[in-house]
Amino acid sequence: MYIHIGFIKNQLRLRKHLPTMQQDVGSILKHHRKEMGLTLEEGAEGICSVSYLSKVENNLIHPSDKYIALFEEKFKVDLKEKPSRLEEDIIDFIINKHFYDEPIQVDLKFMSGLDYKSKLNQLMYLTITNQVERAKKQYMELMPYIKNLNTKELKLFLYSMALLLTKEGRLKDAFSVLNLDMPYKMDCYLGCLMMKMRIMLATKMNNHPFILLNYEQVVAYLIDHEYYHIAHELKYDYIVYLVQFITLENLEYMLDKSLHLKDEQKKYVLARYHFLNGSYEEAYPIIQGLELYDINFYNLSIQILNKIGDKEALKKLISSQKYKDNIQMNLMSSYLNEKYFSRRLTTTSFIKNQIMKINDLPDMIDQLHFWYEESLENFKAHGFYKDATQMGHLIYRKIRDLSLTEY
């Protein structure tokens, strides 16, 4: 299932009026109407006008008692008001746990209602707990209810979608979705999480203007409000970003001063430095045994192993399929599997079809460099100079586009 960013933007444009009611009657009515396959006209037939039902479903008005009785009869549903405090408490609980990076344990039966708030809670929970396919199905169920969301709920929806897109490897789309919530505000936990994610994505895409304009003031804000754990995460992302621009001496000095970094994080930073500087034999021993620590370690590990030609270790990593939900990691793993093991396709055929034609180029700068080097090496070896030039132009434009992302 593909998540279309344009569809989300169009739904937000249709959101002309903010909901004035917080009851769940409207979204429950909409759920049952769609379950029965009825249009607005068919749902309102014999009860009220189409515009009246539309306003009820979008939480702009509350139906009078005489209409509620008719709706209950037509849709075979109980529309008596139920307290919605539980759903709001669950939202706050999930956000607070996620903000402090604590395990989230919630029984899904508490989020099994037919109203939009329950659907939103399920989307956030499934996304945070890495249930990507179920989260994508929940997204499709929630989309018709965008008009029902208040400002806080819309922020939660956009953040959930950005998380989901990031897990798929669609970093630029995730960044664009976060920027649908303008202007930037960090006046709550959710606002801080959204800004943290923007900067994290910017560091992976080499979006230099956004980093220069926002990083220092965001970290200062987080420290002033004693959100030290978030500030430390951003500092780690920033050091990983800086690795490509500084000397080893300066890097080691920064790591010595960064007492908040975990040992694993320091190892990743050093390994990435050596990899970017072509010292592949020095890079791999640093992260050996940590290849599956997280997706960044995995991405770096398979690229290093590809460079040093360690087929046994590479095959073990590829066969783990730990990050199968990430489109770009899947492509890289499939390519390396074809290159070294299955050999059903030539490397040039794979790059031409899967990278240049069928799939989007990656948004992570390291993965763009990977495809640039692999395509030039293979195309030139086979005399496909036109394809090599075309791929170079595509990647150059992609890198430029990522560094100039609107914000």
Briefly describe each language-model feature range.
Residues 2-35:
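A short, Lys/Arg-rich alpha-helix, primarily the initiator
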Residues 31, 41-42, 70:
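Alpha-helical residues within helix-turn-helix
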Residues 36-55:
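Short alpha-helical DNA-recognition segment
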Residues 64-81:
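DNA major-groove recognition helix of helix-turn-helix/homeodomain DNA-binding modules
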Residues 76-92:
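Short C-terminal boundary/hinge segments that cap the last helix of small helical domains
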Residues 89-112, 121-134:
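Alpha-helical segment of the N-proximal tetratricopeptide repeat
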Residues 116-401:
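Extended amphipathic alpha-helical coiled-coil/heptad-repeat regions
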